[in-house]
Amino acid sequence: MDQFQHISVVDAQEKLQQQDLNAVLVDIRDPQSFIRGHVENAFHLTNDTIVELMNEVDFEQPVLVMCYHGHSSQGAAQYLVNQGYEEVYSVDGGFEGWHKAGLPVEK
């Protein structure tokens, strides 16, 4: 895949729940927002944690990127594609869309 794909919050949740896919959600919001609430098991991706992500997540695993509203995640998703990740999605609507859809959040 040379490009990331877009995914809705509902489809993102479904993909994360499929155990056989071993999908990973990365949240690129600021630390304070992440602490206030995030998707369960989300990886907080920052400039300081990118190496950790690349060491822990195989390039074949689906990676879903979430930001506030679904805009900044597109740049981060393309960056991950450029690093070699094969199946990368930008979550349309971001955390706001996830929260408005009533999907589960942990604090």
Swiss-Prot record:
InterPro entries linked: GlpE_sulfurtransferase, Rhodanese-like_dom, Rhodanese-like_dom_sf, Thiosulf_sulfurTrfase
Annotated ranges, domain Rhodanese: 19-107
Pfam family, one: Rhodanese
GO molecular function, one term: thiosulfate-cyanide sulfurtransferase activity
GO cellular component: cytoplasm
Residues annotated as the enzyme's active site: C67
The entry's keywords: Cytoplasm, Transferase
Reactions listed under catalytic activity: thiosulfate + hydrogen cyanide = thiocyanate + sulfite + 2 H(+); thiosulfate + [thioredoxin]-dithiol = [thioredoxin]-disulfide + hydrogen sulfide + sulfite + 2 H(+)
GO biological process: glycerol metabolic process
E.C. numbers: 2.8.1.1
Major place of residence: cytoplasm
SMART domains cross-referenced by the UniProt entry: RHOD
Cellular location(s): Cytoplasm
Family: Belongs to the GlpE family.
PANTHER family referenced in this protein's UniProt entry, alphabetically: FAD-DEPENDENT OXIDOREDUCTASE, THIOSULFATE SULFURTRANSFERASE GLPE
Record function comment: Transferase that catalyzes the transfer of sulfur from thiosulfate to thiophilic acceptors such as cyanide or dithiols. May function in a CysM-independent thiosulfate assimilation pathway by catalyzing the conversion of thiosulfate to sulfite, which can then be used for L-cysteine biosynthesis.
Record protein name field: Thiosulfate sulfurtransferase GlpE
Primary gene name: glpE
